[in-house]
Amino acid sequence: MIAFAKQFRVRISPQKARLVCQLIVGKKTADAQNILSNTPKKAATLIAKLLNSAIANATNNHGMNGDALYVFECVANQGPSMKRTIPRAKGSSNMITKRSSNLVVKLSDNPNERQELIKQQKALVKKRVEGQQKAKMARQKAVTSVVKAPSKTQGGVQK
């Protein structure tokens, strides 16, 4: 079972938030909290609050054991950005984009659930690649059969 918490329009760049997200994926929640409390980044405090919210959601709403939870996924996607101008020389101006993030933390009580999902995705990709290879071979076969078709003319002279 997966429990999650979301937070939108967080005033931090998604590139900076992803660095912190990568630290906690696959860890136990207690370990993740320790990592986040010792990480000297602004994103660490924001993700720590979101992690605590996800833990509360898992225990209160889904009846999961808080000690047996793992961080299944931590995602920092791009949110809307605020555009500001800064004056430059000769009456011109440049744009400043103040980026925001949409954060999602997902928790699971099964530590092998992530590996199972990865195996399923790899199987789907393999199946898709095999289908593409079959289609490519069929196209090549069709092209070669058109090329090998006997012609009615030989050297410009009809028979």
Swiss-Prot record:
Residues 129-159 are annotated as: Disordered. Changing residue 114 to T: After 20 and 32 telithromycin passages; confers resistance to various antibiotics in combination with a 23S rRNA mutation with and without protein L4 H70L. One of its GO terms (biological process) is response to antibiotic. InterPro entries: Ribosomal_uL22, Ribosomal_uL22_bac/chlpt-type, Ribosomal_uL22_bac/org-type, Ribosomal_uL22_CS, Ribosomal_uL22_sf. Coiled coil: none annotated. It comes from the Bacteria. Keywords: Antibiotic resistance, Ribonucleoprotein, Ribosomal protein, RNA-binding, rRNA-binding. One of its GO terms (cellular component) is cytosolic large ribosomal subunit. It holds the Pfam family Ribosomal_L22. One of its GO terms (molecular function) is rRNA binding. Belongs to the universal ribosomal protein uL22 family. This protein binds specifically to 23S rRNA; its binding is stimulated by other ribosomal proteins, e.g. L4, L17, and L20. It is important during the early stages of 50S assembly. It makes multiple contacts with different domains of the 23S rRNA in the assembled 50S subunit and ribosome. The globular domain of the protein is located near the polypeptide exit tunnel on the outside of the subunit, while an extended beta-hairpin is found that lines the wall of the exit tunnel in the center of the 70S ribosome. NCBIfam families: rplV_bact. This is Large ribosomal subunit protein uL22. It comes from Mycoplasma pneumoniae (strain ATCC 29342 / M129 / Subtype 1).
